Design a protein with these regions (language model features):
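Generic structural signal for short, solvent-exposed loop/turn connectors between secondary structure elements
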Residues: 6-9, 26-40, 94-95, 161-180
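Short flexible/disordered coil segments
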Residues: 22-26, 46-54, 58, 123-124, ...
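Low-complexity, flexible helical/coil segments
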Residues: 22-29, 43-49, 96-99, 117-124, ...
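Accessory terminal helices/loops
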Residues: 115-120, 130-201
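Active-site HxH/HxHxD metal-binding segment of metal-dependent hydrolases
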Residues: 1-51, 70
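Metallo-beta-lactamase
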Residues: 51, 58-145
């Protein structure tokens, strides 16, 4: 999409340039009928934050850390008390927790958003209708609970194949079945794997 705006300032996290070089991204672009060579990273990359002056108002673009992906950014409109969260939040369905998500860090990124929210703030998600801080706190707890439950099951020696039926989940079976291999792999990378429990005689 950004190739169409080469002559305009485009903003995004600095990690996008490397992400666009991934074989999976090239394959997905080809499947959609796009030439992978035409993919463009933002020409105004940011690491943490950038303020943009629009004349009669300014907006802030902030990276609170990895979550839905490594490079999620949030757009804050202070004078309107609006925060555009992108896919860090989803209202119309459970959050998409794909292979490029960061389950452990995701709630921390949401904490950055929640620190800016008051009873009047309107939050605009990546998918669905705008929502308020009650929804924002609830979904933050749900995402955190997914990682926490998998971590608990692994500590109890529960293997991937048994996790869906053994755990207590906030989301539907299809959502959890899709994220479980990702969660187990991310925890395995931290050295957390199911180990058999010794029986006490």
């Amino acid at each position: 999409g950004l190739a169409a705006f080469d002559d305009l300032p485009t903003y995004g996290h600095e990690s996008l340039e490397a992400a666009l070089q991934a074989d999976q991204v090239a394959a997905e672009a080809a499947d959609l009928g796009f030439d992978p060579e035409e993919l463009r990273a933002p020409n105004r990359p940011l690491a943490l934050a950038r303020m943009i002056d629009l004349g009669d108002r300014h907006v802030e673009i902030v990276h609170f850390g990895p979550g839905h992906t490594a490079g999620d950014v949030v757009v804050i409109v202070p004078d309107a008390d609006v925060i555009v969260t992108g896919d860090l939040y989803e209202q119309s369905a459970p959050p998409a927790m794909g292979a490029d998500c960061h389950l452990k860090a995701w709630p921390v990124a949401l904490d950055g958003i929640l620190g800016l929210v008051n009873e009047r703030t309107l939050l605009v998600p990546g998918h669905g209708e705008p929502f308020d801080r009650v929804f924002a706190f609830t979904q933050r707890a749900e995402i955190s609970a997914v990682y926490g439950q998998v971590e608990y099951l692994i500590a109890q020696g529960v293997k991937l194949d048994d996790a869906l039926k053994t755990g207590e989940w906030q989301y539907d079976d299809d959502t959890i079945a899709a994220v479980l291999p990702i969660a187990f792999a991310q925890l395995a990378a931290e050295g957390k794997v199911p180990r058999p429990k010794l029986r006490l005689l």
